[in-house]
Amino acid sequence: MRLDKSKEVFDNTKRYIPGGVNSPVRAFKNLSITPPVISKGKGCRIFDIDGNEYIDFVLSWGAMILGHCDPDVVNRMKEVVEDQIAFGAPTEIEYKMAKLVCETAQIDMVRFVNSGTEATMTAVRLAKGYTGKKKIVKFAGCYHGHHDIFLKEAGSAVAELRLKRIDEDIVQNTIVVEYNNLDSVEKAFKENKDEIAAVIIEPVAGNMGVVPAKKEFLQVLREICNLHGSLLIFDEVITGFRLSLKGARALYNVEPDLVTFGKIIGGGLPCGAVGGKKEIMECLAPQGNVFQAGTMSGNPIVMSAGYATIKKLKENPHFYSNLEMLAGKLEKELTQVFSNSNLTFCINRVGSMLTIFFGVEKVENFEMAKMSDLDLFRSFAEYMIKNHIYVPSSQFEAMFLSVAHSENDVEKFVEIAEEFCSSKRK
């Protein structure tokens, strides 16, 4: 696979953008190949400027659940862009989008922002304002955006690149505990009695690789928050509208006080949201005294893309059963391939998200994820990409499927994975 044009553009970009990218994981820093510079996406396929075609299992980090450039989403955006780009003023599509999100996700109220980071930052500020408390609990390996309060022992590219440039003064009120470990949570509450405003968690972690929370763990976490007058925040930036119309909450039957969204909610455009119980949400300005603002929040083009996406998901509930079938097939056949190759591994999957961990048999938290064979995963990722299967370059990210994927696409993934295993035996 040749990437001559991609290399030229990427090298030139480094003169004007730090590292040549606008988000670190895109740089393929831990691989020995140049990141393909993408020029086009259609369905489950993307194309680079060198003419290479890939089956995409990254999907803009999970955002493109309908596949790239879904016709209904594109047409809706075209209709809007002739008359509306940005106003910084109310528009009718904001109302329609808010109503659709609240009814579909079964929440009382929602506030739209421009990214997942803004959503989680707003949720924590809101929790502190509502409870009058200062501290938050987060889990090692969970990634809630790039604000300092969340980067303490975070997953995603922070872990892969071993980045530690955070303001210790800001994170002094951030308490980090172990995912799926109730003892560590109870200890945190005991040592910080009446000081914890909220617990924020990815109910299915996607940034230490895919690591699902245990059902009992989330249920007891809900009880602990109730007991101590703390809010429970589900970060569903990745899982919202991906695992179901109600996100991961439907899988666990646990209701948080606040939930954050991103990725899918914007239909591929920059968007985030925080939603939840009315009495809490009404604390946001201008109704309440917890400040949050954004000139581009509720942008009409973004709202239109998100509306078209969620509406299509709502009108086609079979999409989720099809995604479960395809992802289950991928998990089952990869398990057979790796088992036949006598590899030690585990595959964590929830719905249409999955991660392969080499060198370990079980991953339930960040410490376990870090014990996996990172070098072997890098070799695997590089081999897959060179052979036109686009996967995350980082162990601590998830792979995704879209409704545009077919059984043939899954079989091609498995075929290339089998070739990788054969190459390792030689």
Curated annotation (Swiss-Prot):
Disulfide bonds: none annotated. It is found in: Cytoplasm. Pfam families: Aminotran_3. GO terms for biological process: protoporphyrinogen IX biosynthetic process. PROSITE patterns: AA_TRANSFER_CLASS_3. Its cofactor is pyridoxal 5'-phosphate. Pathway: Porphyrin-containing compound metabolism; protoporphyrin-IX biosynthesis; 5-aminolevulinate from L-glutamyl-tRNA(Glu): step 2/2. The keyword Isomerase applies. It catalyses: (S)-4-amino-5-oxopentanoate = 5-aminolevulinate. GO terms for cellular component: cytoplasm. It is an enzyme of class 5 (isomerase). NCBIfam families: hemL (TIGR00713), PRK00062.1 (NF000818). PANTHER family: GLUTAMATE-1-SEMIALDEHYDE 2,1-AMINOMUTASE, GLUTAMATE-1-SEMIALDEHYDE 2,1-AMINOMUTASE 1, CHLOROPLASTIC-RELATED. This is Glutamate-1-semialdehyde 2,1-aminomutase. It comes from Caldicellulosiruptor bescii (strain ATCC BAA-1888 / DSM 6725 / KCTC 15123 / Z-1320). The gene is hemL.
